[in-house]
Swiss-Prot record:
Source domain of life: Eukaryota
Protein name per Swiss-Prot or TrEMBL: Uncharacterized protein SMPP16
Entry comment describing in which tissues the protein is expressed: Nacreous layer of shell.
Length: 9
């Protein structure tokens, strides 16, 4: 994913 959607990556 992209840093911002969930902050996971």
């Amino acid at each position: 994913f992209i840093a911002g959607l969930n902050g996971l990556r």
